[in-house]
Amino acid sequence: MDAMAVTMTIIAYLLGSISSAVLICRVLRLPDPRGVGSNNPGATNVLRIGGKGAAAAVLLCDMLKGTIPVWSGYYLGIEPVLLGVIAIAACLGHMYPLFFHFQGGKGVATALGAIAPIGLDLTGMIMATWLLVAILFRYSSLAALVTVLLAPMYTWMIKPQYTLPVGMLCCLIVLRHHQNIRRLFTGEEPKIGEKKLQMPKSQ
């Protein structure tokens, strides 16, 4: 790995470590998403506690955390496999943020943002898959899992040279969802839009 790729990997992790959900909730004077609802600082949980506007802002910011470093690396001529490493670094920053006590989200939106530079057709297929599963079953986590399982196949169909890095990224997302998988099997996973909240954790 050359110096440019190492630098972009570090930048990607640090950018990913900026928790959009926590900062936006602070600005809007909403509860800390790490202590209410699903305790996950992501767009779905912010939707539960703050509504569509706040959730959309979180979604956009989380996607940009993946898009900016990967797109920058692409234009700097970094090879596809190393772009995958940069994407993983951005997602790891989102999942284990340096600036927020390593309490982060699941990385789905950041991963989508990282994949977006590959092409709008691939991005559209991924988003359509997520929306279809989410509408049919009302589980954000299930939609994410189905989408990441299909994403490498979509990538192979469109730009096969990026299949390996996308597959690496998707494996990380699946591992991060291990608790959601357990709750889906036990029937305890909250559905999209549910308003039932837990009391904030004591600081």
Curated annotation (Swiss-Prot):
Coiled-coil segments on the chain, per record: none
PANTHER family membership: GLYCEROL-3-PHOSPHATE ACYLTRANSFERASE-RELATED, INNER MEMBRANE PROTEIN YGIH
Domain of life (superkingdom): Bacteria
Similarity comment: Belongs to the PlsY family.
Compartments (UniProt record): Cell inner membrane
Topology versus the membrane: Multi-pass membrane protein
UniProt GO cellular component terms: plasma membrane
InterPro entries: G3P_acylTferase_PlsY
Keywords: Cell inner membrane, Cell membrane, Lipid biosynthesis, Lipid metabolism, Membrane, Phospholipid biosynthesis, Phospholipid metabolism, Transferase, Transmembrane, Transmembrane helix
EC number annotated for this UniProt entry: 2.3.1.275
Subunit and partners: Probably interacts with PlsX.
Record's catalysed reaction(s): an acyl phosphate + sn-glycerol 3-phosphate = a 1-acyl-sn-glycero-3-phosphate + phosphate
NCBIfam families noted in UniProt: glycerol-3-phosphate 1-O-acyltransferase PlsY
The protein's name in its UniProt record: Glycerol-3-phosphate acyltransferase
GO process annotations (BP): phospholipid biosynthetic process
Pathway assigned in UniProt: Lipid metabolism; phospholipid metabolism
Described purpose of this protein according to its UniProt entry: Catalyzes the transfer of an acyl group from acyl-phosphate (acyl-PO(4)) to glycerol-3-phosphate (G3P) to form lysophosphatidic acid (LPA). This enzyme utilizes acyl-phosphate as fatty acyl donor, but not acyl-CoA or acyl-ACP.
